[in-house]
Each structure stands twice: as structure tokens, then as C-alpha cells.
Amino acid sequence: MPAIRRHTPEPLRWADSSDVRIRVGFGFGGAARPDDHDAFGHLVDDLERLGFDSLWVSERAGSATLDPMVAMAYAAGRTERLKFGPAVMVLPGRNPVLCAKALASLDRISNGRALPAFGLGIADTAEQQAFGVQRSERAAWFDEALPLIRRLWTGDVVDHDGERFRLDGVRILPRPVQDPFEVWLGGQAPSELRRCGRLGDGWLPSFTTPAAVADGIRLVSETAAAHGRSIDPEHFGALVPFVHAALPERFAQRLRDRQPDLDPAEVVAHGIRGLRSRLEELVSVGASKFVAFPLDEPSDWHATVEDVATELLPLQT
């Protein structure tokens, strides 16, 4: 990887208020995957040592990336400060009681460092088959499961008789340390944005443009208001993919298939300096929580994390 010239970036200015906290995390998955004890352990150690806010692990049942729940538990036991979340955890197909129990336990043993984030899952037949839910059924499953998980996190006895789940006197203990245990949602389709406004506490899209983030923040906020809710202005972020060299054609084609009218360069930053520029654009439209996400496998994970830290961590407020 080309050497990065060291410098101290100028502080970013928030679009509406200088009091909003900018935070930078680091994520991995797909083709970029430290997937053994040494590689993943050293990555976790670097993130903790350098002062990253959080670690994020993608969920792909059919890929070689680590299972996010296992990876987060490992990180919890290896660190004292670093937060961690799935980017994002597929909810349709999961037993909501077991999911609530696992995440509450993770938050408990980490002393309140878990960051629950859920989504419908990617539009991939093999992935959908792995979770056992038809694409047409995912939204209804999600809409019943998430409120049920929230009720279970209260520690109260829960009775529920729904279309997919029935519970008679189920109680989850221990409760999460965080109260409330806030949930971030992924996705960027209008239906997903409205769901975030109805059910979520924060929004974390990926592979998106600053303009789309600005539009999404408006729709999420408007939907929340229409349902008598509000989303904390600090709870809008983005997972920001980047590459060290040219974007591999296989990724470019996937992006073109997903959004034919979009230039892949608009959603994938080129180099660490390009990554910083993309964060500046996102901050200007109201986002403040970011996950730097390498799309290609770094030749040296340690050097990559060091370079991202040098370029981005001074921007945290």
C-alpha cells in the first residue's frame, strides 16, 4: 500500500451544531476478513490501542467472514473500551428470544459496549435460504421480531401471540447494562427508512452517497415524528467502504447491478485520503457516526489501521 503522508486534519464542522460527537469505527467482512486468532486478535488490539470508537463485523452466512456474535464476544473479552456491533445482523430468520438473550448477555459481560444493529439481509438467494425466510416475508418477520426483542430486554415477563411467534411468560435475564439498549437499523430503500423511523433508534446505511444520506435523514426523522417519536440527531451515520487501489471489477459490477445509474466511485472512497473526504461530505449533511470498511484485502492490516487512525481519528469530537 502506498505510504500516507502524515498530517493533522482540520477539525470537521457539523452541519447544524458543533456539539454533536463525531465517532469513527472500523469494520470488515466480505473479501477483507482477518479470520484467524492472530490476525483478528491483532486487529482488535490495534483498534483498542489507537482509540477507534468501535469494531463492526458484517454478517454473511455464506462467506468466509467470521460470525458477528462470536467475533464480538471475542473482542469483548480482549478489550476494555472498544465498542462493537454487527454491520448489520440479519433479523428475519432469527429466534427473537435467543437473539435478545445473546445480545443482552454480550452487553452485560462487556459492561455496556454492545451496539445492536439489524437489517433485512442482502438481496441474495443463497443468503436468504441460509436464514430460511423468503424475501417477501422478511419485512413482516422483522416488524414483529424487533418490538418483541425490545420487550424482552426490559426484564419483564413477556406474553406474545403473534403471526410468527408465541410466548407465554418468557423472561430474559440478565438485562443489558445499557438502558435503553438502543438499536440501529441498516438499509436505504424508502420502506427501510420508514421502518427505521417507526422502530429504530439510529440509522447506519452502507454503500450510499452523501445526497442519499441527507434524503434518508429527512425521511427517517419525518416518519419518526409522524409516529410520535424522535431520533437523536447524533444517531445518523454511515458505513463507508474504501479501496487502496482501483475498485475490483467484481465489486464495481455488483454496485452497478444494485444501482445502475450510480457511478461506483460515488459510494466507494479511493485511498485513505479519499476516505477522509467522504467523511467530510457526510458530516456536512448531518451524519456523525462512521465505519471505515476496506473492500479489498489489505496487504498489511496493521499498517492500514494505523493509516486510517492517523487520517480519521483526529476528526473525532
Model-derived features: where do they sit?
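N-terminal beta1-alpha1-beta2 module of alpha/beta enzyme domains
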Residues: M1-T79, F181, L295-P298
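Alpha-helix-loop-beta-strand connector modules within alpha/beta enzyme cores
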Residues: W14, L66-V88, W141-L148, L152, ...
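Hydrophobic faces of well-ordered beta-strands that scaffold small-molecule active sites
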Residues: I22-F28, L55-V57, K83-A87, A114-F118, ...
